Amino acid sequence: MNHILAIDQGTTSSRAMVFDEALTLKSVAQEEFPQIYPRPGWVEHDPSDLWSSVAATARAAVERAEIDGSLAAIGITNQRETVVVWERASGHPIHNAIVWQDRRTADLCHALAEAGHEPLITGRTGLLLDPYFSATKLKWLLDHVEGARARARRGELLFGTVDSYLIWKLTGGRAHVTDATNAARTMLFDIGRGIWDPEICGLLDIPMEMLPEVKDCAAPFGMTRADLFGREIPILGVAGDQQAATCGQACFRPGMMKSTYGTGCFALLNTGEERVTSRARLLTTIAYQLGGKRTYALEGSIFIAGAVVQWLRDGLKIIREAGETQGLALSSDAAQDLVIVPAFTGLGAPWWKPESRGAVFGLTRNSGPAEFARAALESVGYQTRDLLEAMRADWAAGAEGVLRVDGGMAASDWSMQFLADIIGAPVDRPVVRETTALGVAWLAGMQAGLCPGPEEFAADWALERRFEPQMEASVREAKYDRWGRAVRAVMAV
């Protein structure tokens, strides 16, 4: 028994991958599911869609791998912050899952901030008082579903992030657990003491009876139902998607950084045992927890990364598929200084201006599809530098001089070269791009005794290509200064 199933439950699709004990990918299955938008700014998922897509892809991946019953362990990684509440007795959700993107609790967050509660919340959880996180979404459910809070106090209702709900379903209701990285994203978890915070739960009137047990990222989370895979399989690894990618990128030393480019972008800087309080409105979070020991990180999130390419395709209709952007960027007029600030849903870290909206600067009569494509790709590099500048300002120990990248946009050579140019540092792209699934497969495999510990795993990390800065420093700083003026203009409107 020497294979590991990695379940990767994302925002728009569920994926499952089978790895062998050498962490070589053997099979992949993927299934998309519907997004639900009840009102502007509201985003929901039907929990039954999450479960059915996970169950279907897990079975399909195992079947395609042709591993003849040699599945030894399961790891789960997931979209973070999304909230599910379900009945303990039946397992039925009492409402759709409220997704991390959902902004319905913006007024509540504003009221809590006005009442002076943000220092307490940030000091304990490392997070900003924002609808992005789970706590106010959970309060909204308890406030708006009739009888929910009383039922929760009686122990009839359970709360979980997506990982917790999936473990409940996989184990047939035998395990109500989560891991430290997912707990750290709820805005209810004291990341210094490693416990659910009674004061914050009291402030939001959230019954602590409904909260899951918190475990290490590599730990026994429970055994699956025997009918799912022909026998019971242990769930041995769990981490939120960005923390799993941090492990998959082997960013185990303080100072190591990774940046994942999907719809948005998430950059994490390992700060080791030091819990750094950000002055630049970055998030302080748990990178991973192993053997009861927490390793911390600074995290910055960009709302729009790959989504700016989707806008070129679906909004402006100047490309038919994402792969066309690189060719267009290569053919663009370098003399034009078009700047796109893609604040379609506001500005993320380090600005946190949800009310800001996007803009295009430097438009001329000669600006065409090629210039728009280049400016769109450049915007991702500029935003990444914003995050890295904030991280350097926050942590005196400083980041190492190399950024490891993954995600869909990392496949673009042009984008990665510009990223190296604009941050003025090498950008490393790994051989294995599926770093999120790889990270949680490693966690589960390590707990199962199949995979090595962090040091040996890091030694096996393989570089596919390093992008070295080629842009002259004067050009780099002039371009970044132009970007800064554009962002300030957007925030001033």
Curated annotation (Swiss-Prot):
Gene Ontology CC terms, in alphabetical order: cytosol
GO molecular function term, any single one: glycerol kinase activity
Positions annotated to bind ATP: T11, T12, S13, T263, G306, Q310, G408
Top-level taxon of the source organism: Bacteria
EC number: 2.7.1.30
Gene3D superfamilies found in the cross-reference section: 3.30.420.40
Residues involved in ADP binding: T11, R15, T263, G306, G408
Amino-acid positions noted as binding sn-glycerol 3-phosphate in the UniProt annotation, renumbered to this chain: T11, R80, E81, Y132, D241
Catalytic activity: glycerol + ATP = sn-glycerol 3-phosphate + ADP + H(+)
Role of this protein: Key enzyme in the regulation of glycerol uptake and metabolism. Catalyzes the phosphorylation of glycerol to yield sn-glycerol 3-phosphate.
NCBIfam families reported for this sequence: glycerol_kin (TIGR01311), PRK00047.1 (NF000756)
Name of the featured protein: Glycerol kinase
Gene designation: glpK
